[in-house]
Structures are given as C-alpha cells and as structure tokens.
From Swiss-Prot:
Residues 69-265 are annotated as: 10 X approximate tandem repeats. It comes from Orycteropus afer. GO terms for cellular component: chylomicron; extracellular vesicle; high-density lipoprotein particle; low-density lipoprotein particle; very-low-density lipoprotein particle. Homodimer. Interacts with APOA1BP and CLU. Component of a sperm activating protein complex (SPAP), consisting of APOA1, an immunoglobulin heavy chain, an immunoglobulin light chain and albumin. Interacts with NDRG1. Interacts with SCGB3A2. Interacts with NAXE and YJEFN3. The lineage of its organism: Eukaryota, Metazoa, Chordata, Craniata, Vertebrata. This is Apolipoprotein A-I. GO terms for biological process: acylglycerol homeostasis; cholesterol efflux; cholesterol metabolic process; lipoprotein metabolic process; phospholipid efflux; positive regulation of cholesterol efflux; positive regulation of phagocytosis; positive regulation of phospholipid efflux. SUPFAM superfamilies: Apolipoprotein A-I. It holds the Pfam family Apolipoprotein. InterPro entries: ApoA_E, Apolipoprotein_A1/A4/E.
Length: 265
C-alpha cells in the first residue's frame, strides 16, 4: 500500500503541477508558464556562469595557452548572441506552453476537485494524528523533567543510572509514535486507494476519448514551434559564424605551428 501511495502522489503532482502544493498551503498559485520560465532562466544563467569558469580554466592550461583560442575575448559576443536567441524563442515557447496548459485545463480541474474531496476526508485524521503526536511529546517532556534535575546535580554513578532510565522512556516514545503512524496509515489506506482508482479512471477516460486529439494537437504545436524557431536559429547561427571562424583560424594556426616544430626536429 505504501508503494501505491507513492505512485499516487507522484502521479497527482505530475498532472496537477505545483497547483497541489498551493492548494494545501492556500497560497496564491503561480502560473504554469511563470514556473517554467523562472526555472529555465535560473538554469541557463547557472549554465552560462559555470561554462565561463570552465573556459577560463581551459585557457589557463598548457593546451589552452598553446592553442590560444581566445574564447573569453569572444565571450561577451557569445553571451549576447545566446541572450538574443533566448529573447526570440521566449514568446514561441510561451505560446506553446499556454496552448498546452489551456488544453489540459479540464483534466487538471477534475483532478483538483478530486484532491479537494480527498483533503476534506483525511483532514480529521491528520488533525487527530498531530494532536496525539503533541500529547506524546509533551508527556515525554514531563517524564524527562525530573531526570534533567538529577543530571544537573548528579555524579558519574548517577549518570549511568540516568542512562538506564532514559532508555525505556525513549523506547516508549518511539513505540507510541510508531503506533500512531501505523494507525494513521490504516485510516488513510481506503482514501488512498479511492484516489488511486479515481486517477486510473480519469486516465482511462482520457485515453479512450481525447488521447488521439491531444497527440494531434501536440504534433501541431511542435511543427509550429519548429517553423517559428527557424528565423531565430538562423540569426543565432549567423551571430556565431564570426566567432567560429576565429576559433578555426586559431586552431589551424596552432596545428601549423606544431607541425613546423615537429619538422624542424
């Protein structure tokens, strides 16, 4: 049953996105496109920073000095060209994502409704579990209070006695909490299975009715993406050409120099 619960959770999070997290926390949800855009921006910025470090280390090496590619001299040109590509591609990806987000909205609404019903059913058990957990911890603290006094006033011999007293208390707390966890798992099992069956039913209905339609629309979006991206990628290629030609000349010059040295030996 634990495995089923994990699979269920992952499936719900995958299909509903971060909306589930905002649902539980009652936060204002961030749009799907904003989440993707922020993630990609952070990733690309980190990639550019780390790439510059690698290039700097390479140029400082013996081979880098010998080749003298001067990549860092052209780094600003490369960065600006790459940034321009990002700016040109952003609206294309945004439209693609918004279209897909709109088309899958009905399914996500149904799943969020199922999740709302599940939350209402299991919330009393979660509240009860939290209450019992706090009671057990408070009881443990009360039992520990006199032992703390003994610890402050005790000798080495008393320390050993305290250790013997602490052992059963720790085991008692552990066993109590474990029993509460087991009870909670048992109480939630029917609802977990119910949600799993609902999810399977929703996916089966999607497969029978709209899967072919989604596949066709996804293919259309990808074809449109390729067509719309062609001008931006061509501009990117044109911007890279001077830099690549400079690299080529540097490599050829380094190879020519190495050949001359070998022939002169």
């Amino acid at each position: 049953m634990e495995t089923k619960a994990v699979v269920l959770t992952l499936a719900v999070l995958f299909l509903t996105g971060s909306q589930a997290r905002h649902f539980w926390q009652q936060d204002e949800p961030q749009t799907s496109w904003s989440r993707v855009k922020d993630l990609v921006t952070v990733y690309l910025d980190a990639l550019k920073d780390s790439s510059r470090d690698y290039v700097s280390q390479f140029e400082a090496s013996a081979l880098g000095k010998q080749l003298n590619l001067k990549i860092l001299d052209n780094w600003d040109t490369l960065s600006s060209t790459f940034t321009k590509l990002q700016e040109q591609m952003r609206p294309i990806f945004q439209k693609l994502w918004e279209d897909l987000d709109k088309e899958t909205s009905p399914l996500r609404e149904v799943l969020n409704k199922d999740l709302e019903e599940l939350k209402q059913k299991v919330q009393p058990y979660l509240d009860q579990f939290q209450k019992k957990w706090q009671e057990e911890v408070e009881l443990f603290r009360q039992k520990m209070a006199p032992l703390g006094t003994e610890l402050r006033e005790g000798s080495r011999q008393k320390l050993q006695e305290l250790q013997e007293k602490l052992g059963p208390l720790g085991e008692e707390l552990r066993d109590s909490l474990r029993s509460h966890v087991d009870a909670l798992r048992t109480q939630l099992a029917p609802y977990t299975e119910e949600m799993r069956q609902r999810l399977a039913s929703r996916l089966e209905a999607l497969k029978e009715s709209n899967l072919a339609e989604y596949h066709t629309k996804a293919s259309e979006h990808l074809s449109a993406l390729r067509e719309n991206a062609k001008p931006a990628l061509e501009d990117f290629r044109q911007g890279l050409m001077p830099v690549l030609e400079g690299f080529q000349k540097s490599v050829l010059a380094a190879l020519d120099e190495a050949t001359k040295k070998l022939n002169s030996q």
